[in-house]
Curated annotation (Swiss-Prot):
Function of the protein: Esterase likely involved in ester/lipid metabolism. Shows strong substrate selectivity toward short, straight chain alkyl esters with the highest activity toward four atom chains. The physiological substrate is unknown. Is able to hydrolyze ester bonds within a wide range of p-nitrophenyl derivatives (C2-C14) in vitro.
Noted pH dependence of activity: Optimum pH is 8.0 for the hydrolysis of p-nitrophenyl hexanoate.
Sites annotated Involved in substrate selectivity: G58, H155
Effect of H155A: No change in sensitivity to Zn(2+)
Record comment: activity regulation: Hydrolysis of a fluorogenic ester substrate (MOAME) is allosterically inhibited by divalent transition metal cations (Cu(2+), Zn(2+), Ni(2+) and Co(2+)). Inhibition is largely due to a two order of magnitude drop in kcat, with relatively little change in KM. The thermal stability decreases with increasing concentrations of Ni(2+).
Protein name: Esterase Rv0045c
Enzyme nomenclature, EC number: 3.1.1.1
Enzyme class: hydrolase
Source organism of the structure: Mycobacterium tuberculosis (strain ATCC 25618 / H37Rv)
Highest taxon above the source species: Bacteria
Amino acid sequence: MLSDDELTGLDEFALLAENAEQAGVNGPLPEVERVQAGAISALRWGGSAPRVIFLHGGGQNAHTWDTVIVGLGEPALAVDLPGHGHSAWREDGNYSPQLNSETLAPVLRELAPGAEFVVGMSLGGLTAIRLAAMAPDLVGELVLVDVTPSALQRHAELTAEQRGTVALMHGEREFPSFQAMLDLTIAAAPHRDVKSLRRGVFHNSRRLDNGNWVWRYDAIRTFGDFAGLWDDVDALSAPITLVRGGSSGFVTDQDTAELHRRATHFRGVHIVEKSGHSVQSDQPRALIEIVRGVLDTR
């Protein structure tokens, strides 16, 4: 096990072999580089123009998609949302889908102007809905991972245990060691592989000068009303595929039916068994196959 000092100096791409193993991929690892566009940081995968854009959930970062992207084998852009990962924080702590999409639109035009698909999970999915409504040229097709515009209502209905790692966003922010952060995360997601959780915490944390560790993401201090995004769904021209975690309560059958009713081009829903909210972390191989199936229909 690496010490805190060794973790501090570890390159962010040093663990990609673990992602390849998790994805069941043999052979050389794909090209990947960190790119910056103003206040937004992202990971650009592959040696050609990105075909897929990935937007993560609240309290996550672009590396949450590493295993899926390695397994998919397509050129991609995984974005750190505002206030997350290596992207800049907002002074007002407002990371609503509406503001996120306004920030991301020019970035995506610069870094992935010809992308065909957007895969968005949780807050990233809601951001993608708003983005598709305001800039339809940027979202040719949309895959939503365990989210609809009823997300805040569902979040309020769940217990802390049911929220899993999402509950960590509202807890302690500073820890005396990396292991203390990892222990808390393991307790929140006991069903998940410890090696995967350790990798996730590594990407989602940073060490302070005093030796303590903190989460990389800002505290979301202002919550907007997501329900208005249902009107955006009404206006979307992009086809939509919904992926649900079979053990997650963040999307209900009622929400699925509402999405089906409102979306002009609803391709269908995939329920991933033995998965909670973060399907890309709980069952990455299943998500790889679903996304590949969507790509193959183009």
